[in-house]
Amino acid sequence: MTTRRRAAFGALQTKAGGRMNMDNEVSAGLAPFCMRVADLVVRIRPLHAMVGRLCKDYVVDASLAVDIEIGATQADIDYERDMATEGTDWTDAYLETLAVQRAIANRLPEQHRLLSHGAVIEFEGRAYLFTAPSGAGKSTHIRLWRQYLGDAVRVINGDKPFVRIPECREELPVVYGTPWAGKEGWQRNDSAPLAGIVLLSRSEPGASSIRPASAALNIDKLMRQVYFPPDAEASMLTLDLLDAMLARVPVYDLACDMSEDAVRASFEGLTGLDYHDYVRSASHED
């Protein structure tokens, strides 16, 4: 781990704090269910029906071998309420869905996986992760890709994808859809190899551009878009996984407005294809 990354990690850990207690209370009243997410079978002991409805696209046979077992307590729900910066009238049922997400995320590093904050699209079998602080325009940019490129673009997840980093250094990380998909609800139970990570920012109108970026020089930004568990060992493992991911996946800076030219810039920079040639070819095929 580089000195820069250790320093950024130390600052992040200082702010992290928190406590979670996900595994010591059995839910009453509702039957446990199993879901498959990021190629892991997770057994959930729900307190409220909402979490089951949220995960319905991922539910699998309960007889499968379980990789992770979790269940949120009322204390965990109260913790999520304390962590909320808005929406203090959220119900316990909704907050349980956040607590379950956090519980799974806390266990991902031991399975060579991590949770990222970003929107993921898949184009021709390769995934691209757009990440930025909330409100920077990720969803708008994804919506423009879908508007101008149609069914050739699939959204894997709009907010909280999981990423698996294979132990083999020759293999690309794989990004997965999850039920936690932001206010748009863009998600699918699918996966694709991760071919690019995009640091998105807004540009002046007509000034959209994309360029390769240094992962080392942008490590602070990248770390802020990855979930680090409160457990020190799991956090260190997450940092190792992030290092491994960045060693295999190129990073880009994208400055974009809300126009078709923003799609052209990011499309050409990420895929290496000529945007207008591709659009003409696709229209002829239709």
Q: How would you label these PLM feature ranges?
A:
Residues 60-104, 270:
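Charged, amphipathic alpha-helical linker segments immediately N-terminal to NTP-binding catalytic cores
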Residues 105-106, 112-114:
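N-terminal active-site beta-alpha-beta segment that forms phosphate/nucleotide-binding
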Residues 134:
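The conserved Walker
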Residues 1-20:
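N-terminal amphipathic/basic-hydrophobic helices that include classical n-h-c signal peptides
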Residues 137:
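Conserved glycine(s) of the Walker
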Residues 141-142:
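Post-Walker A alpha-helix
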Residues 23-32, 38-56, 63, 89-90, ...:
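Glycine-rich, often acidic-flanked micro-motifs
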Residues 11, 18-19, 72, 88, ...:
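Intrinsically disordered, low-complexity regions
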